Amino acid sequence: MKKIFYVLLVLFVIIVFVKPDIYPVSACENQHPTSLFSDKEASIICIDSKNIYDFNDNDPENIAIPGHLYFPPNIDSPVSLIIISHGAGGIFRFHYDYKDMMLEHGYAVLIIDHFTPRDTIIDFTFKYVTEPMMVSDVINSAKILRTHPRLNGKIGYIGWSKGGIGPILLKNKHLYDKLVYKNDFEFLAGVYTYCGFDIDKENVTDIPMLLISGNKDKITPASYCSELISKLNDENIEYHILADAYHGFDNYAFFFGSYLPWQPVLNANTDKCLLKINPIFQTVNLNDNMDLSSLKNRTRFLDECTSQGAYVQYNSQPSIDAKKILMKFINKHMPN
């Protein structure tokens, strides 16, 4: 009975707090990469992406992913672009608060909908909409928009929670060079994202990175990011741990706080459960006896490396602090 209540509660939150699309996502069905319904300040683009289950997937299906593109008003010269990648709950209204803030500072913003064209509403696991799929969406967006006449070719990449795993993975130079080629990102950023990955400190990109964690976050613990950053010893990584901040501290859908009993909590404190990208671009554990290349394998990994249940809560002060930190970082590394 409790589980039914929590499911109904989540559906209510999604209906109330998820921002309606400016255009229907069905507009991208059977479309080539292009801009549709374009006007002066907003349009939708159809991203020619791939459903890659893991980075070594050699025969992925093509998929058209919608992205909502916004331009700052009253600026006629080309501007820089910030790509936003949502988390496990999809696109929420708070993402649009960040978008509005970035527009006010003169940046264009693309918010990608990773879920709807994949028939997904929420995905609290690594199983259905995988991190390689989301990275593919972002990279292919950058390729399409790099030559847009209203953009200057400079692009930054920010992800929240599940969507922030991509920026972490792209600090791996071996993977970055395979996926991104010469289309450099000006910066990478992750807000309360999962840092349970091992990266060789000799194989790190020099792209500036910002990470922001909450000190009370049990879903994506700050300790995992601290350990990764300590190992990499990379002066290009800026890290902030915010006080009194749970997972989702900037999402007012969690205004009253909520315990999510079904929420998987990944344990990255052993070689069995710490992940890496191997030389053939598989996502594997450090023991090399589990990979994430199939639904079956990912289910096994989750069964063996997760517990369930975590608390989420909005907190206005960390939310304000995160916005200030993020905007200062963007202005420093991608000034208009």
Segments from the language model and where they lie:
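Short substrate-entry loop that stabilizes the transition state in hydrolases
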Residues: 75-79, 84-121, 196-198, 216-222
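Short glycine-enriched nucleophile-adjacent loop
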Residues: 146, 164-178
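A conserved short beta-strand
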Residues: 177-194
